[in-house]
Amino acid sequence: MPLSNGRNRRTRKLFKRPFRGHGLSNTSTILHTYKVGDYVTILCNSSIQHGLPYKAFHGKTGRVWNVNPHAIGVMVNKKVNNRIVVKRLHISPEHIRPSGCQKDFLERKAAVAAIRKQNIQLKKEGKPLLPLPAKRLPKQPRPAELIKGADIKFTTVAPLKFEELY
């Protein structure tokens, strides 16, 4: 009914489980170790109502600020009118998963650390240092290619000469 205003109202499609994904979740979701400062994504699991966050936080990414035996404290930014408010939620671990938002950053950080380690070794040997990647670049165009072979026939394309139709 459209006028009923319960806590989980209008979540029929939002909280639905994926195809062949019904029933209880794996134990690995509960046993995952979260530390303070980790980025997590809130994805509500409707098969477990305990510790289920409000529907407005479904799909949001936040940081862990508190770890309890049965719940994880997550800080999430929420837009309220014309400002952004930090909300602190306690969520059951079934409804959160590690976020991949820092994956690219951590990979680049590890790559830069490896280059710096190589540069220390090269400096001791007196060889030129490797350049550090300054910032991320968009995908570059493909390099030029040479076409080899005498059997390739080229045709010159030119516009037709204008002829008056009147």
From Swiss-Prot:
One Pfam family from the record: Ribosomal_L21e
PANTHER family the UniProt entry points to: 60S RIBOSOMAL PROTEIN L21
Family under the similarity heading: Belongs to the eukaryotic ribosomal protein eL21 family.
Primary location recorded for the protein, binned into one broad class: cytoplasm
Molecular function as annotated in GO: structural constituent of ribosome
Location(s) in or outside the cell: Cytoplasm, Cytosol; Cytoplasm; Endoplasmic reticulum
SUPFAM superfamilies to which the protein is assigned, alphabetical: Translation proteins SH3-like domain (SSF50104)
Gene Ontology BP term (one): translation
Name of the gene this protein is made from: RPL21
UniProt-recorded name of the protein: Large ribosomal subunit protein eL21
Entry keyword set: Cytoplasm, Endoplasmic reticulum, Ribonucleoprotein, Ribosomal protein
GO cellular component: cytosolic large ribosomal subunit; endoplasmic reticulum
InterPro entries for this protein: Ribosomal_eL21 (IPR001147), Ribosomal_eL21_CS (IPR018259), Ribosomal_eL21_sf (IPR036948), Translation_prot_SH3-like_sf (IPR008991)
Subunit and partners: Component of the large ribosomal subunit.
Function: Component of the large ribosomal subunit. The ribosome is a large ribonucleoprotein complex responsible for the synthesis of proteins in the cell.
